[in-house]
């Protein structure tokens, strides 16, 4: 039987393909306080108008598809569609611009970073009309933030648990990252903690391999921590990596860490996924466990200036999903990181209210609605000569993590830890006395080295080591 369309059915619907900009480019739209706002860096294919490319991003990341569909008549399209409300040309870039898109809150499941990212970045990055696309920033409305738990504990609760105030915390990643037996691994942990560090850490790819099963590592590390605490009188910790093939196995490892009375565990939030991370974060709050987050795989998404997802977006997503620490780069070490950009997303992790500041890459004012902050972790190619700059750049609410800068000390692990602790204490004292760490940092370290042979040896070993490469991710 042939289908015949009535006259009434023809009204308001016409099959076919039409330009995205006719529906999704809405320069007269005023964003609502409840909208999620996105800033995309768009590079369209040659010949594609800016308005059409921007509207295509809005459509494909919300309600649109490539052709008109009659089921649009069964919903309120104007209520649910993403709206490109502004286009901002980029100086010096002929075929690149920033597209500002507003998404109605009802498009997203409450408390789900997974669903939010699936919608906003899940499909549109493969769109043929675009040569490249990068999500630069998101504005998360308070109405949506209130559906998330956020970090298990936050900065202040962590300090109260550790009874450590007025300075950054010191950490160390155990090296070599792979190949040590569990017993030798525990020995290295003990030596570093006894020497003066607050934390030691599993590297991101230590899970449960043939040379070192997770349960054995946990047992030897727990023994090392209890011994170091008894000798130093300080609370110590080790980031036990509970990242696992399944969520069930992840929680099993977390439970065992709790049985051993460990204060903190660790998770690789990108490789494991946001669903697993949010699950673990909620478990940590319920069980009084701090959660350290490693960002393994982040540079796959955020390193290229024109395509991917900027780390400030990943940082916001992590704060929502939950974590008490996250690696942020160092500015001065071996890993990529422009100072202004890095401090921009460090503030987005730690502060409660951050104003728009394009000089630091912050496209939107962000109110975190009293959600606890996340402690920044500076890690990657740092040593004692970097200490003054690190303290000046990151302030107190950070973990300064020296892997090779501890274990590479010529006298061994414990002296390496002592050298870092002495350098940190000297910088904190100098700062509190009003000295300029950036201008006088070298003198401060040399003065401390006169009475600390461990620091003197470290200074001599690493005096020529620098990582001077131009940052790729700039404003």
UniProtKB/Swiss-Prot annotation:
What EC class does the entry list? lyase
Protein residues bound to Mg(2+)? 201, 203-204
What domain of life?
Bacteria
- The family this protein is said to belong to: Belongs to the RuBisCO large chain family. Type I subfamily.
Name of the protein in its database record: Ribulose bisphosphate carboxylase large chain
| Cofactor: how and how many bound | Binds 1 Mg(2+) ion per subunit.
What is the reaction catalyzed?
A: 2 (2R)-3-phosphoglycerate + 2 H(+) = D-ribulose 1,5-bisphosphate + CO2 + H2O; D-ribulose 1,5-bisphosphate + O2 = 2-phosphoglycolate + (2R)-3-phosphoglycerate + 2 H(+)
What other comment is given for this protein?
RuBisCO folding and assembly commences when the nascent large subunit folds with the help of chaperonin GroEL-GroES. Both RbcX and Raf1 help folded RbcL release from the chaperonin and dimerize. Dimeric Raf1 binds to RbcL(2) leading to an RbcL8-Raf1(8) complex. RbcS displaces Raf1, resulting in holoenzyme formation. The basic functional RuBisCO is composed of a large chain homodimer in a 'head-to-tail' conformation. In form I RuBisCO this homodimer is arranged in a barrel-like tetramer with the small subunits forming a tetrameric 'cap' on each end of the 'barrel'.
Give the protein's cofactors: Mg(2+)
Per its record, what are the GO molecular function terms? magnesium ion binding; monooxygenase activity; ribulose-bisphosphate carboxylase activity
Q: Does the keyword Lipid metabolism apply?
A: no
Q: Where is this site: Transition state stabilizer?
A: 334
Keywords associated with the record: Bacterial microcompartment, Calvin cycle, Carbon dioxide fixation, Carboxysome, Cytoplasm, Disulfide bond, Lyase, Magnesium, Metal-binding, Monooxygenase, Oxidoreductase, Photorespiration, Photosynthesis
The entry describes its oligomerization and partners as:
Heterohexadecamer of 8 large chains and 8 small chains; disulfide-linked. The disulfide link is formed within the large subunit homodimers. Interacts with assembly factor Raf1 which helps form the holoenzyme, most interaction (and folding) occurs in the cytoplasm.
Q: Where does substrate bind?
A: 123, 173, 177, 295, 327, 379
Is Translocase tagged as a keyword? no
Active site: residue positions: 175 (proton acceptor), 294 (proton acceptor)
User: Gene3D superfamilies under this entry?
Assistant: Ribulose bisphosphate carboxylase, large subunit, C-terminal domain, RuBisCO large subunit, N-terminal domain
* InterPro entries hit by this protein: RuBisCO, RuBisCo_large_chain_AS, RuBisCO_lsu_C, RuBisCO_lsu_C_sf, RuBisCO_lsu_fd_N, RuBisCO_lsu_N_sf, RuBisCO_lsuI
For the modification N6-carboxylysine, the affected residues are 201
Subcellular location, principal: other
Q: Which GO terms describe its cellular component?
A: carboxysome; cytoplasm
